[in-house]
Amino acid sequence: MEQNKIEKMLGKIDFAEFGTLRDYPFLIGLQLGFSMNGGGYAVCDGGKFTVNISKECKWESQTREAAVTASLERVEEILKAAKVNYVSELVGKPVEVTLVNSAFKDFRILTEVL
């Protein structure tokens, strides 16, 4: 059995947007892009912080509300950690990005250097 390769890389947020995904307009939320190694390596969040708002999605009412609330609470946590008020102000903030098998897993704002 092959082990997952976990990497933690230092970098910065290259883009930060809140809205729908271009190719998947039923997904809405925060979308982030990161660059590491002085811009030599880039990765996106893959829609990790989005929620399916499609009418065809078979949500239980409370489950949908909980998912939307959790998504917005995550945005609030990120903004607070970065000490900003707007998503656009996240661009340029220092981060530690966690990759598993070279795919985005998670990130954290490097609050210790802000």
Question: Could you describe each region identified by the protein language model?
Answer:
Residues 1-114:
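Short beta-rich binding modules
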